[in-house]
C-alpha cells in the first residue's frame, strides 16, 4: 500500500492466463483540516478532513481512511484528530486544532503622569486572564511591551515609566491556560481594536 510520502503498488494475477499486472498507487501528499482555529461560542467544533495524493486526487473518507474526533470539542482547548489509512493506503496521521477564547474590547485609556490607565470589558467565560499590549507604533511593530494579567475578573491596569508627551497605542486580548500533551499551554483570542493615548509630563 501507499503511505504519506511513499508510493505503493498493486499486483494482480490473471486467473485465466496467469500473467501478473502491476499498477502504482500515488503517495499521500497532503492531509489537512478545514480550519485550525475557532473562537469559543459554546458549540461543538468539528473541522472536516481533506486528503490528497501526489497527483492531486482526493481520497475518500470511509474507503481510504477513517477519522476519529475527541469527545467534547466545545470548550477552549487544543484538540487532536486522528486519521487512519486503510485499503490501498497505510499509516496514521494526527492533526490538531484550537478553540480559542472569545476576545474583549478596550473601554478607555486615560493619560497619567508618565503613564496611563487602561480599562477593558470583562470576559470571564472560558478565560484565565488577559494580555495588555502597548506600543509607540500604531501597528505594534516597534517599542512594544506586553503585560500579563493573571485574573479574568481584573478589568484595569496602570502602566508607568513611559515617555512624556509621547503617543502610545494600547490593545488587549484574553487567554486561557489549558493542558495538552501533559503540558500547560496558553491559547489567545485576537487582539482588540487599539486606543491611542498621549502621555502627560
Language model features: what each stretch is:
Residues 160-180:
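Beta-strand-rich modules
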Residues 153-157:
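Short S/T/G- and acidic-enriched coil/turn segments that sit immediately N-terminal to beta-strands
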